[in-house]
Structures are given as C-alpha cells and as structure tokens.
C-alpha cells in the first residue's frame, strides 16, 4: 500500500512541475508550486524523514509563499490565464507531460536505472552511522553529515535562493 502512495505522490509531483513550467498565470503558477512542495514533503515523510519533511514544509512553503504572494499581488490580471484558456499553454503542458513520459520509459526500459543512480561514493557517510546505540537520532546525524560533508551543497543552496529572490524582484519591478 505504501508503494502505491509514494507512486501516486511521485506522479502528482512530476505533473505539478510540468504544470508550472508550462507558464500559466502567476496565480496558478504559485498554487502549483505550493502543491508540489506539499507533495514533495509528503514523499520525504513517507520515507521516514519527519524532521526533514517538516523543515522543507516550513522553509519552502513559508518563505516562498510570501514571495509568490507579493508577485501575484503585483501581477494581478482581470482574466488570469489557465492551462486550457490558451492553446499554446495547453500544448506546452501536454508536450511537457509527453516528454516526461518518454524520459521515464527510456530510463526504465531494460533496467537501466544504474546509469542514473550510482552509490559509489557512500563510504564517507558511514562515519555517521548511529548503530543500535539509541542515543542519537538518525535525522540529527544526517544534519551533521550535511553540514560537514555537504558544505558545498549548503553554500550552493543558499546562493541559488539568493539569486532566485533577486530574479523575482527584478521581474516584478516592472518598467
């Protein structure tokens, strides 16, 4: 049963990002990003990462909701464009779904998942194994590993969020 739930959440996750990338009105784009963020947190929760799912939910949906609230307030339209109101937007949505489907079929044919995921460099993370001691939480050890071995990942994430805010401010500034 859990496999089916994760499978359905994954399908909703991909469809929501295709729906966002087909460029509807900013109101619906923000709504789709909120839905995809909540579904992504549900996927993380289904794999047992309750702390990480909660942090993503609070940071992403809290911070980005404010940004999209301001952008939709600045870009309000009398008749917002939905996916079926314009043939170009609907075509982009359908083409995005078809390309995702073809990519999934290409990756999954003949069990070629090894070409996408390889776990060769996992030896460094074994240091943070909590074992059966019961004193340390696995999530706390994961956060410690993220900040020690994944310093570059934290820096790139912070920089990309900063650039994202600058781009949103530039787009909504107007003429």
UniProtKB/Swiss-Prot annotation:
A single Gene Ontology CC term: mitochondrial inner membrane
GO MF: NADH dehydrogenase (ubiquinone) activity
Alphabetical GO biological process terms: mitochondrial electron transport, NADH to ubiquinone; mitochondrial respiratory chain complex I assembly
Top-rank EC class of the record's enzyme: translocase
EC numbers, comma separated: 7.1.1.2
This protein's record includes keyword Manganese: no
Function: Core subunit of the mitochondrial membrane respiratory chain NADH dehydrogenase (Complex I) which catalyzes electron transfer from NADH through the respiratory chain, using ubiquinone as an electron acceptor. Essential for the catalytic activity and assembly of complex I.
Protein name: NADH-ubiquinone oxidoreductase chain 6
